[in-house]
């Protein structure tokens, strides 16, 4: 969590677009070195007896070239979700994090909607420009709704598409974890009426 990551825009929400361009769309050499060190330390701490490290970070959608340079055999899971749902959720997350760790007063929800829509578009454009760099067999695309509604089958599809071994031994543990989470109900994401109206207008 340094100023070279997307968390800079959370700490300084009044300058979110500038930090997004600097730290997400144009990652620095220092960030690459820090990411490599962080990944190695995480592996040393969590990777004993395991064969894969899974990183979930939407900012990496814009870092395909960097990730392949650092980890040539990296495999990618691209999650398709309705943009309006993704953006609405991210606006709420940004608002809450700004209250927890922000060093500035957060912008209005209306402004955050506009900035987040722009950032989402730039993120998708960056991925579209670089997806051809991903070698065959190292990318699988799945629908968010499939993951939510049929998690076990969707995860099996990921294992198969990316040729990850060990599904038979992992299946029961994954199924048990899914069963424990069945009682969870996601909190509805509700924006202020003006912000919601603006979001729908921008995506119409």
Model regions: which residues?
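PAPS-dependent sulfation machinery
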Residues: 1-53
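Short, hydrophobic/aromatic alpha-helical segments in well-folded domains
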Residues: 38, 63-66
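Active-site-proximal structural scaffolding
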Residues: 28, 60, 69-72, 79, ...
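Short, solvent-exposed loop/turn segments at secondary-structure junctions
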Residues: 6, 59-62, 82-86, 92-93, ...
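PAPS-dependent sulfotransferases, especially Golgi type II membrane carbohydrate sulfotransferases
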Residues: 26-29, 43, 91-204
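Conserved phosphate-donor/acceptor-positioning beta-strand/loop module used by diverse small-molecule
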Residues: 57, 67-92, 158
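Short, well-ordered loop/turn elements at secondary-structure boundaries
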Residues: 46-50, 70-74, 136
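Short catalytic-loop micro-motif centered on adjacent basic/acidic residues
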Residues: 52-55, 141-143
């Amino acid at each position: 969590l340094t100023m070279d990551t997307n968390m800079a825009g959370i700490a300084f929400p009044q300058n979110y677009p500038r930090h997004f361009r600097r730290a997400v769309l144009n990652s620095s050499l220092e960030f690459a070195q820090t990411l490599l060190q962080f990944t190695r330390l995480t592996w040393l701490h969590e990777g004993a007896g395991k064969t894969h490290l899974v990183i979930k970070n939407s900012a990496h959608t814009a870092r395909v070239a960097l990730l392949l340079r650092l980890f040539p055999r990296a495999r990618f899971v691209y999650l398709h979700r309705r943009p309006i749902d993704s953006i609405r959720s991210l606006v709420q997350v940004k608002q809450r994090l700004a209250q927890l760790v922000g060093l500035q007063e957060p912008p209005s929800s209306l402004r955050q909607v506009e900035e987040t829509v722009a950032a989402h578009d730039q993120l998708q454009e960056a991925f579209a420009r670089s997806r051809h760099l991903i070698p065959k067999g190292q990318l699988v695309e799945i629908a968010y709704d499939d993951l939510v509604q049929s998690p076990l089958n969707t995860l099996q599809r990921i294992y198969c598409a990316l040729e990850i071994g060990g599904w038979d031994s992992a299946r029961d543990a994954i199924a048990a974890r899914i069963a424990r989470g069945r009682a969870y109900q996601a909190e509805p994401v509700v924006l202020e009426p003006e912000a919601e109206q603006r979001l729908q207008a921008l995506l119409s």
